[in-house]
Amino acid sequence: MKNIKLTLAYDGTNYHGFQEQRGTGLATIQEALEKALSTIAQTPIQVIGAGRTDAGVHAQGQVVNFRSEKWPVPAEKAPLALNVLLPGDIKVVKAEEVPMDFHARFSAVAKTYRYSIYHHRVMSPFHRYYCYHEPRRLDVNAMQEGAAYLLGTYDFKSFQAQGTPVKDTIRTIYRADIIEDAPVINLYLRGNGFLYNMVRIITGTLLNIGFGKIKPEDMVKIIESKNRTLAGTTAPPQGLCLMEVEY
């Protein structure tokens, strides 16, 4: 029995998220990957993903693992073998054999996400699937001030999609940076875990700070309230990218 860890990069534009949606006929990253794996192994292969990215969300460093008794390809050659079978918008960038107790989701200690905003009057056609377009004036310095209040361990219930069945909403944020590379503004968040839609809701809240609708220090009140209605709207999916999963 082998346990193989794969690092993936994908453009999520044409997929209904990472997780397989059986019986729906909807294209997913997991479905495409398992099809390629099963073709090579000549037996059904199921993968475990580090994160379930939503429809339209991208990844540069998604991680999965799978266990198989019949996997015939050495780990170092797996990317080449798989990439021949995978569509052009999904690629395996690294493969390695790992201990049997490795679990792509539960072994993770940190994840980094990036949310990209195209800040210009006219949206670039080359960025339309990878950035959220915001033509209005933004105070980026105020947004950075607001992001700094996210650092630390808090109950982030205010930044979780309503109706999500998660009891433990306490998370730790290690990094919250806004880096402007005009006309793109990138928000980087690194934490020990993220609630459903957490990064996109944080982005919407920081945009409200950038618009001057709320003050940077209001981020503290929003966190303490544990009230989703006080946070900003959920930013669109296309600006979000899973950059790295750490173990």
Curated annotation (Swiss-Prot):
Which residue positions are annotated as catalytic? D54 (nucleophile)
Q: Which InterPro entries match?
A: PsdUridine_synth_cat_dom_sf (IPR020103), PsdUridine_synth_TruA (IPR001406), PsdUridine_synth_TruA_a/b_dom (IPR020097), PsdUridine_synth_TruA_C (IPR020095), TruA/RsuA/RluB/E/F_N (IPR020094)
Q: Which UniProt keywords apply?
A: Isomerase, tRNA processing
Residues holding substrate: Y113
A Pfam family reported for this protein in Swiss-Prot or TrEMBL: PseudoU_synth_1
Example GO biological process? tRNA pseudouridine synthesis
According to the UniProt entry, what is the EC number of this protein?
5.4.99.12
User: Which proteins does it associate with, and in what oligomeric form?
Assistant: Homodimer.
| Family under the similarity heading | Belongs to the tRNA pseudouridine synthase TruA family.
The protein's name in its UniProt record: tRNA pseudouridine synthase A
